[in-house]
Regions:
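Expand to "…catalyze enediolate/carbanion chemistry for C-C bond making/breaking, isomerization
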Residues: 1-300
Length: 300
């Protein structure tokens, strides 16, 4: 089961209330990489069925212009999640986000439901992927188990609000309260070979703070960030897209390593910096990211 979309570009995942047709009919205009159609927290208890119908209709009729269509279903401890998955698969979503994931078994339950519905609605096996949201101390502690749980899982995402509540603290804007979870999650994700995404930044008035937050998680190795407003998209894309300077240096590294390797030379310099074979994968990733972001102009 090898779905090429597991590694697709996901710098931004923008939350949208599935209950409001006006929000989910043309969000592709904002150019987020992924659109998170929300059936969970954004929808009142007595509106779950309405939101699910609205979601199904949007998935069937709206052209999202290449943006990934992710649906956050209701929790596995609610009576709604199974019908949510049925609507997602029948409607044609690309991925499903599991909220409040704490164990590998949570992922297995969703994967089994997806498989049943793919068969029912004639979709290829393994076409619908999974992302698990970690929202508690237990979920973060079990990050590696969750990351290695199922082939359908392409990544994990931090949900900072519920996580800090579980830690008996709160979101400060500094990121200090999230540091441990972020480190644990990115290490687990990289060990398992899946992607890792950061939590939302809710203070829309503090764009300087938002930029700093994005810069920090980029340096930590995250693949992208959940967002709640279109104004946040350009900042995330700017920071997560290689500059031409980065790309040119990466090209030099790849070409030099390829040529020096044939000569048996293991260490050399590029632009005055000492380089060895350990730099190769990072340089290739930079070039691959540039290609996926549409900014690559080279010949590799």
């Amino acid at each position: 089961m090898n779905n090429p979309n597991k590694k697709r570009l996901r710098r931004t995942m923008m939350f949208l209330n599935a209950q409001k047709p006006g929000l989910i009919k043309d969000p592709y205009i904002y150019k987020a990489d992924s659109l998170m159609l929300d059936l969970e927290d954004a929808v009142a208890e007595n509106q779950k069925d309405v939101a699910r119908f609205s979601l199904y209709h949007a998935l069937k009729t709206v052209d999202y212009r290449g943006a990934e269509r992710v649906v956050r279903i209701n929790g596995l401890d609610t009576p709604y999640w199974r019908e949510d998955i049925r609507a997602c698969v029948a409607g044609g979503c690309d991925s499903i986000r599991i909220p409040k994931t704490e164990h590998a078994e949570d992922v297995h339950r969703v994967a089994q439901a997806i498989a049943e519905d793919e068969k029912t609605y004639g979709r290829p096996e393994g076409e619908v992927l999974i992302i698990a949201a970690l929202e508690s101390a237990r979920g973060v502690m079990n990050a590696l188990e969750i990351c290695e749980s199922d082939e359908l899982l392409f990544g994990i995402a931090l949900s900072g609000g519920d996580y800090t509540k579980d830690l008996q603290t709160h979101i400060t804007g500094t990121g200090i309260e999230l540091m441990g979870a972020r480190q644990q999650m990115i290490i687990a994700a990289r060990a398992a070979g899946v992607q890792c995404f950061d939590t939302v930044y809710t203070d829309l008035k503090d764009m300087d703070g938002f930029r700093k937050d994005v810069e920090n998680i980029h340096l930590m190795g995250f693949d992208g960030k959940s967002i709640i407003n279109p104004r946040q998209i350009p900042i995330v894309h700017e920071i997560f897209t290689p500059t031409q300077k980065d790309i040119i240096f990466a090209e030099k590294v790849v070409k030099e390593i390829d040529s020096k390797k044939a000569l048996g030379i293991g260490v050399f310099t590029v632009d005055g910096k000492m380089i060895d074979i350990a730099f190769y994968d990072g340089a290739k990733r930079t070039i691959d990211l540039a290609k996926a972001s549409g900014v690559y102009k080279g010949d590799l």
